[in-house]
Amino acid sequence: AVQCECYFPMTPFRHEPPTTQRLMQCMRHGKACLMRLQVKGLRQRFKWWGFPYIPLAKVRHCEGYINDNGRLLSADHFEITITDIDFRIIAKEYDWDSLNVLDLWASDYGKLPKPLTDCVKESYTGKTSLKGVPGQDLYYVKAKGDLNSYYGMTAQDPLQLDTLFDEDDPDNLWSECADDPEGSYNDHRPHLFLPYQWGVWTTAHTRK
């Protein structure tokens, strides 16, 4: 439903001046924004709210924080990379002393291509109409798998590092070769036929 009904980044991302003022301008103009933020003095607006939004696993350089089952109740300092959708949710749930925009990219919102959404709708119709129908188990599983794959194809890791096997080192048989991550990305990029950002925004929309 998200991929059929919601809007996604549809133009190449443009690098914007990393300022709070420019971020607000981009969001007022309805741009899809990807940002890296530094936040100081974070705290919940409503301390009895039972489901804090920011996951501890997604922040970096976090200091002086209170962790509630993997979620941030407060923090003295941290960095995080989020979308404009995430930012709006965080702004409703939290207050902070200061916020610095370290990096900012913007794209234009639009609907996903009709051929893609038509495939999603067809698989969804098949999945829901075949569920529980005697003798249709195989077709139900196939339709369900197809439906899941449309998201999966947008969420492939864009940086596939080479894996090395060293039979002479039993304690470290497998290791990732990270000597040239940019080269690995460029080698893998031709296989990414659906934009990775569509997968990012799919999950962001579901969190609203």
Regions flagged by a language model, labelled:
Residues 1-208:
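Conserved acidic
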